[in-house]
Amino acid sequence: MKILDWSQLDVAARTDALTRPVQTVAAQTRNAVAALIADVRTRGDAALREITARFDGVSLERFAVSEAEFAAAEAAVAPELRQAMQDAVARIDTFHRAGMSEGYAVETAPGVVCEKIVRPIGRVGLYVPAGSAPLPSTALMLGVPARLAGCRAVVLCTPPRKDGSVDPAVLVAAWLTGVRRVFKLGGAQAIAAMAYGTESVPSCDKLFGPGNSYVTEAKQQVAQSGAAAIDMPAGPSEVLVIADAGAQAAFVAADLLSQAEHGADSQVLLLSDSDVLIDAVQAQLEIQLAHLSRADIARQALAQSRLIKVQTLDEAFAISNRYAPEHLILALREPRAWLAQVEAAGSVFLGDYTPEALGDYCSGTNHVLPTSGAARAYSGVSVASFQNMFSVQAASKAGIAGIGECALILARAEGLDAHANAVALRMGVAA
């Protein structure tokens, strides 16, 4: 990894140091995704069969996972893995349940009551990618809050394997969260099916979950068309670590590598006021890389990542807030004392013994988080992501008499005569 001294960088160099790997969607990708979506929208299941055969190398007559397949998956998953997933579900449930939104009502004036009502989104679609490895943890992170929200229809799509089956761990994870409708579909075609619906796959109001560039582009296109809402902008995984001289270099290096191994386009950053620590982390990266099965991928990610020397920890937090990382690790002696300085991050990990991997799997927080700087305005997935909120107001005759004049003055100021008339008629006065 390249080592930089922040104090020696000019404005342009500082911007370059915090620039993420270029994420450009080629016109070819956009057009290919648009064609897939149009095909699925027009021909439904027939298109899904052809596309699945072409990209996944398997011919499927039926996309829905059967009860027998769920049972076979249950038998195939090792007991310790099932128990680990069950434990993770319990903690995810505990954390998300505590943060659930509730409606409220308030009398804003005598005879005028305003309310906020919370309702579950009716139909939601969850996407669990497979790629180079299945991700049952993503099924847990999406399935639990969907269940807590009370969504009446939850659909999950995940790519089939060459033999036409789905990874057993993903199926068990879905089952543990209460998801019973799982379809063997991957890629942009899965997103199109959940957005527009086919003979087999029901259309959904909102789509959730990560994926490759085709999945991400498909989510953007269906959202722009108004077919379905999506959870958040998606991008490659990233972590930023702020560490002081007392941090464990081996721990910091391990945390950087745990994100770097996600993909060649991932980015990891270390900000520290200690030259000694930065050098030690650099050495640890090489030591630990030698033992990683995905070392080649991690090295590609490290090539576009940085170890940055700062003058003070205050400066480190200013840089971090500018970057707005998906994951922020505070490898500091008094991490909670510094938490107030965090303004933008998807999820924060405090201290030497809170690796980002805990949040990925089983601490209880959600690992579906905003990336690419979106943490400045977006939050990670929660129960609220699966809910709608709408307002209600009720005014009595005395209530409108009390506040109607306010409405009349504002309506006249805006030149909206019909607005004024709607109030004046009820008050028995001239508009």
Swiss-Prot record:
Q: State the superkingdom.
A: Bacteria
Its recorded reaction(s) are: L-histidinol + 2 NAD(+) + H2O = L-histidine + 2 NADH + 3 H(+)
Which residues hold substrate? 237, 259, 262, 327, 360, 414, 419
Enzyme Commission number(s) from the entry: 1.1.1.23
UniProt KW keywords: Amino-acid biosynthesis, Histidine biosynthesis, Metal-binding, NAD, Oxidoreductase, Zinc
Q: Say if the entry is tagged with keyword Metal-binding.
A: yes
| GO CC terms | cytosol
The UniProt annotation places NAD(+) binding at: 127, 189, 212
Q: List the disulfide bonds.
A: none
Question: Which CDD domains does this UniProt record tie to the protein?
Answer: Histidinol_dh (cd06572)
Residues binding Zn(2+), per UniProt: 259, 262, 360, 419
- Task performed by this protein: Catalyzes the sequential NAD-dependent oxidations of L-histidinol to L-histidinaldehyde and then to L-histidine.
Q: What is this protein called?
A: Histidinol dehydrogenase
Q: Which organism is it from?
A: Xanthomonas oryzae pv. oryzae (strain KACC10331 / KXO85)
